[in-house]
Swiss-Prot record:
UniProt keyword terms in alphabetical order: ATP-binding, Cytoplasm, Kinase, Metal-binding, Nucleotide biosynthesis, Nucleotide-binding, Transferase, Zinc
Domain of life: Bacteria
Source organism per UniProt: Geobacillus thermodenitrificans (strain NG80-2)
Subunit details: Monomer.
Keyword Cell membrane in record: no
Residue positions binding AMP: 31, 36, 57-59, 85-88, 92, 160, 171
Binding site for ATP: 10-15, 127, 136-137, 199
Gene name of this polypeptide: adk
Similarity annotation: Belongs to the adenylate kinase family.
BP GO annotations: AMP salvage
Region (LID): 126-163
EC number(s) reported in the record: 2.7.4.3
Protein name (Swiss-Prot/TrEMBL): Adenylate kinase
Length: 217
């Protein structure tokens, strides 16, 4: 099964990726992991990517696509893969289509974990961290026994600057704009499937499992 997983920050993509990989035994391929592995192995493309990353620049499409091609040709991808964080643009999506066609494969599904903006805001702005021991809480999902105080060490809880409303709203807006053309592209191709990410974590995975059931029979 050849899958792409998509979702905005806070949609629970990481959790569902873990469950898919564990259940179906396919590798979870994230852009960050791919870059790190290619740089560690010292491949020509990995070294090129390192130059851009060290300068704080975006890695150009041709380098990213080359690294994805190298990764998908490895033995552990023969029975499928779960791509996460790639593609990010329609140009990358088209390159992925061409790359898979070269090796006689195609995507099965692009799974979009769909969560409304207001729910994402609540999830992302509710995080609180202990200044003393680093324990993490959430005002709604995992609140401390006493507001503002760490259960473990009694330290003060604070909100990280990048978890405040303005920063989170901006992050979601940027990601939404970037993702929309990609969702439209995969909708037209017939690969896109929306999963309601506002349900309990287990129900979200149950819906994904139901979708993927036809591929494993």
């Amino acid at each position: 099964m050849n899958l792409v997983l998509m979702g905005l920050p806070g949609a629970g993509k990481g959790t569902q990726a873990e469950k898919i990989v564990e259940t179906y035994g396919i590798p979870h391929i994230s852009t960050g992991d791919m870059f790190r592995a290619a740089m560690k192995e010292g491949t020509p493309l990995g070294l090129q990517a390192k130059e851009y990353i060290d300068r704080g620049d975006l890695v150009p499409d041709e380098v990213t696509i080359g690294i994805v091609r190298e990764r998908l040709s490895k033995d552990d991808c023969q029975n499928g893969f779960l791509l996460d964080g790639f593609p990010r643009t329609v140009a990358q999506a088209e390159a992925l289509e061409a790359m898979l066609a070269e090796i006689g494969r195609k995507l099965d599904y692009v799974i979009h974990i769909d969560v409304r903006q207001d729910v994402l805001m609540e999830r992302l702005t509710g995080r609180r961290i202990c200044r003393n021991c680093g324990a993490t809480y959430h005002l709604v999902f995992h609140p401390p026994a006493q507001p503002g105080v760490c259960d473990k060490c009694g330290g003060e809880l604070y909100q990280r600057p990048d978890d405040n409303e303005a920063t989170v709203a901006n992050r979601l807006e940027v990601n939404t704009k970037q993702m929309k053309p990609l969702l439209d592209f995969y909708e037209q191709k017939g690969y896109l499937r929306h999963i309601n990410g506002e349900q309990e974590m287990e129900k979200v995975f149950s819906d994904i499992r139901e979708l993927l059931g036809g591929l494993t029979r």
